[in-house]
C-alpha cells in the first residue's frame, strides 16, 4: 500500500518506518528496497483486503494523477469484509487499476461491490495484447465522430476484449503512451473503442464531469471487413 497511518496522518513509506493500516488498524512495516516501489506491508503476510494486488510503478503513476485523499479508500461490505479502492472520488466513482491476471468472478464481485466503477487495464503486461490490438484496428474502418475515430469491434477479436468487453462498465486499456483506448459503449455484439488522452481523462474525473460516450445512430453500410479470431 502507498499509505499508512502515523500519528493519525496518512504518510508514505520511508526506510525503517512503522505505521498502522488505515483499513484494519494492523501494524505495517515500510518496505523500501531497490526493486519495487516503496510501500507499506502488513507485518503478517496476509493483506486485509484479499482483492489487493502488489503495487507497481504503473499503479503509482496512475494514482499520482489524482489527489492523495482519493487514493486507497477503505470500505466494508454488508458482511464486514474490507476492500480498498485504488481511487474513490467524492462523487462515489471508483477507479480500479489492474495489472496482474484476475479471475472473471473476482472482476464481477468487485464491480458489483463498487457499482459505479471504471477499470483501467495494463495492456503492456502480455506482449501479445498490443499486437492483437493494433492488428484489430488495422483490419477495421473507423467512423469519424466529433473529430474522434471510433472503431466498431467484437469481443472475440482480441484476448483483452474477451476478458473485459462484456463487463458493462467503462474500461480503459493502457498500452503506454499518452492515450487510453476507451471502451465506453456496447450494442449487441459490437463494442466501440476510441483513443482518449490520459490527461483529459484524469481532468474530467477530477472535475466530476462525465467521460465521452458513443452515441448510437442509424447503422451505416460498411465495406467488407476481414475477421480474425485469436
Label every PLM stretch briefly.
Residues 111-114:
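Short, conserved loop/helix-junction motifs that constitute active-site signature segments
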Residues 56, 103, 195-197:
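Helix N-terminus capping/helix-initiation residues
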Residues 12-13, 27-30, 61-109, 125, ...:
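Active-site metal-binding core of divalent-cation-utilizing nuclease and nuclease-like domains
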Residues 1-71, 77, 211-230:
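Nuclease-adjacent, charged terminal/linker segments that flank catalytic cores
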Residues 2-16, 20, 124-230:
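Non-catalytic C-terminal interaction segments of nucleic acid-processing enzymes
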Residues 116-121:
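Short hydrophobic alpha-helical runs that function as membrane-insertion/retention elements
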Amino acid at each position: 500500500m502507498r499509505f499508512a497511518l502515523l500519528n493519525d496522518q496518512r504518510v508514505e513509506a520511508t526506510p525503517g518506518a512503522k505505521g498502522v493500516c488505515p483499513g484494519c488498524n494492523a501494524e505495517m512495516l515500510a518496505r523500501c528496497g531497490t526493486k519495487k516501489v516503496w510501500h507499506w506491508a502488513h507485518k503478517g503476510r496476509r493483506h486485509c483486503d484479499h482483492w489487493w494486488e502488489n503495487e507497481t510503478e504503473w499503479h503509482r503513476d496512475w494514482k499520482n494523477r489524482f489527489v492523495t485523499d482519493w487514493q486507497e479508500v477503505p470500505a466494508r461490505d454488508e458482511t464486514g469484509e474490507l476492500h480498498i479502492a485504488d481511487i474513490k472520488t467524492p462523487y462515489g466513482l471508483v477507479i480500479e487499476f489492474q495489472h496482474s491476471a484476475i479471475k472473471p468472478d473476482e472482476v464481477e464481485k468487485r464491480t458489483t461491490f463498487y457499482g459505479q466503477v471504471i477499470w483501467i487495464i495494463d495492456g503492456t503486461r502480455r506482449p501479445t495484447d498490443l499486437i492483437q490490438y493494433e492488428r484489430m484496428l488495422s483490419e477495421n474502418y473507423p467512423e469519424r465522430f466529433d473529430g474522434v475515430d471510433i472503431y466498431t469491434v467484437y469481443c472475440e477479436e482480441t484476448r483483452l476484449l474477451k476478458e473485459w468487453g462484456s463487463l458493462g462498465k467503462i474500461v480503459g486499456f493502457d498500452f503506454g503512451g499518452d492515450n487510453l483506448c476507451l471502451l465506453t459503449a456496447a450494442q449487441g455484439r459490437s463494442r466501440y473503442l476510441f483513443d482518449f488522452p490520459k490527461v483529459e481523462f484524469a481532468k474530467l474525473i477530477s472535475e466530476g464531469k462525465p467521460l465521452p460516450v458513443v452515441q448510437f445512430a442509424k447503422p451505416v453500410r460498411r465495406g467488407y471487413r476481414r475477421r480474425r479470431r485469436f
